[in-house]
């Protein structure tokens, strides 16, 4: 079974041994024996920083009777760990960096699941990170229902000089609701809401402390009020792209 949204022209050749797939920024290739340990991957958890990945992995290993932690050799770009069915990977900051990590991780999962669409569909994907809340108390956990860019439109890329590629920014509603339900007895606030992904840390987030500043306190508050009025719960830098690529 195939889907036109998957690059079978390249990926099928990896499965039949015509060529390797080199996950360059992770320092491994499809021919590396280390990937055999990842065949039972059930979830991919992404985060911005490598330090957070180490913390997640060590804690998950402890919760699973000290299961072996597998580390990829290359860490100058992204830090990657695997233990107890979960692949943890950092993606850096912002959609350009995160898109590199996500593209290579998606190719890797395709290889690990031998192109089986049903098996790939069972893999849970999640990004965990810090964000700025919009009208929320500090410490509130936001489970994203949709990822949009700073203009409240979905993620899109330039298609040369001919137009744009647009991507669907919705996250699976049932998954979001299940995460919230599983945490209803915790001691922190958890809600669902729209997440804005800024494509630039200072300008697109209307910050006033950049070397280049094009906004005023008035325009910043106007933007934040507009976001709040349109159901936005938080602001970060990757969600719109991650939703778009995984939906595709």
Predicted regions located by residue number:
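A C-terminal functional module that forms or caps the active site or interfaces directly
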Residues: 221-248
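Histidine- and/or cysteine-centered catalytic micro-motif in compact active-site loops
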Residues: 131, 146-147, 195-200, 240
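A short glycine-rich, hydrophobically flanked beta-strand micro-motif that places a catalytic Asp/Glu
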Residues: 126, 194, 235
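Conserved protein kinase catalytic core
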Residues: 133-135, 203, 244
């Amino acid at each position: 079974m195939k889907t036109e949204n998957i690059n079978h022209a390249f990926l099928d050749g990896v499965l039949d041994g015509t060529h390797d797939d080199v996950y360059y920024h992770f320092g491994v290739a499809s021919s590396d024996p280390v990937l055999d340990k990842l065949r039972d991957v059930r979830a991919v958890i992404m985060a911005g920083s490598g330090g957070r990945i180490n913390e997640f992995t060590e804690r998950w290993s402890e919760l699973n009777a000290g299961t072996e932690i597998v580390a990829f050799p290359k860490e100058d770009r992204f830090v990657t760990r695997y233990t107890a069915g979960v692949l943890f990977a950092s993606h850096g900051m912002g959609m350009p960096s995160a898109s590199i990590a996500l593209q290579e991780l998606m190719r890797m999962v395709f290889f690990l699941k031998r192109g089986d669409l049903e098996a790939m569909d069972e893999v849970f994907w999640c990004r965990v990170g810090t964000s700025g809340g919009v009208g929320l108390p500090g410490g509130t956990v936001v489970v994203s229902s949709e990822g949009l860019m700073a203009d409240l439109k979905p993620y899109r890329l330039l298609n040369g000089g001919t137009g744009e590629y647009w991507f669907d920014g919705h996250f699976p509603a049932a998954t979001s609701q299940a995460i919230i339900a599983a945490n209803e007895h915790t001691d922190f606030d958890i809600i669902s809401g729209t997440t804005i992904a800024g494509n630039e840390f200072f300008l697109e987030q209307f910050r006033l402390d950049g070397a280049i500043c094009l906004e005023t306190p008035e325009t910043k508050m106007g933007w934040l009020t507009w976001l709040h009025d349109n159901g936005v719960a938080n602001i970060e830098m990757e969600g719109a792209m991650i939703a778009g690529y995984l939906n595709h």
